[in-house]
UniProtKB/Swiss-Prot annotation:
The C-terminus is required for mitochondrial localization, while the N-terminus is necessary for mitochondrial fission. Changing L80P: In fis1-L80P; no interaction with MDV1; mitochondrial fission is blocked; DNM1 assembly at punctate structures normal as in wild-type. The gene is FIS1. GO terms for cellular component: mitochondrial outer membrane; mitochondrion; peroxisomal membrane; peroxisome. GO terms for molecular function: lipid binding; molecular adaptor activity. Belongs to the FIS1 family. Gene3D superfamilies: Tetratricopeptide repeat domain. The keyword Transmembrane helix applies. This is Mitochondrial fission 1 protein. Signal peptide: none annotated.
Length: 155
């Protein structure tokens, strides 16, 4: 895998391109034959899509990166990083974790990968905590309703 000294941060993924910029990337892919366009053109377009605020664009970006991952072994490292970001933005945290864990196995000393891994794990932890709180609230509500009915039944 080729080494890259700098990748965008998760924050960069939330700074969308202007529609005209995204259209230029799309036209480049179309002019090169769509699915048979160069890997670099498709990669650039996928990243532009992931940066979008439209969830359908983000999903298409993840799909394109998944295709590139499968066909270009030399780009797998980059794809894993960007797939992690794309899945994170889509709220697919378990997939983001799978991608970042795979990347981290090969990039243990890469600070950006480590930071991204920490962000994904923190988000999963927060989402799990929210789930526990919601479940606890539902349980408390069910107990309150049940006790209300039981009290009224005794009267």
């Amino acid at each position: 895998m080729t080494k890259v000294d700098f990748w965008p941060t998760l924050k960069d993924a939330y700074e969308p391109l202007y529609p005209q910029q995204l259209e230029i990337l799309r036209q480049q892919v179309v002019s090169e034959g769509g699915p048979t366009a160069t890997i670099q053109s498709r990669f650039n377009y996928a990243w532009g899509l992931i940066k979008s605020t439209d969830v359908n664009d983000e999903r298409l970006g993840v799909k394109i990166l998944t295709d590139i991952y499968k066909e270009a072994e030399s780009r797998r490292r980059e794809c894993l990083y960007y797939l992690t970001i794309g899945c994170y933005k889509l709220g697919e945290y378990s997939m983001a974790k799978r991608y970042v864990d795979t990347l981290f196995e090969h990039e243990r000393n890469n600070k950006q990968v480590g930071a991204l891994k920490s962000m994904v794990e923190d988000k999963i932890q927060k989402e799990t905590l929210k789930g526990v709180v919601v479940a606890g609230g539902v349980l408390a509500g069910a107990v309150a309703v049940a006790s209300f009915f039981l009290r009224n039944k005794r009267r």
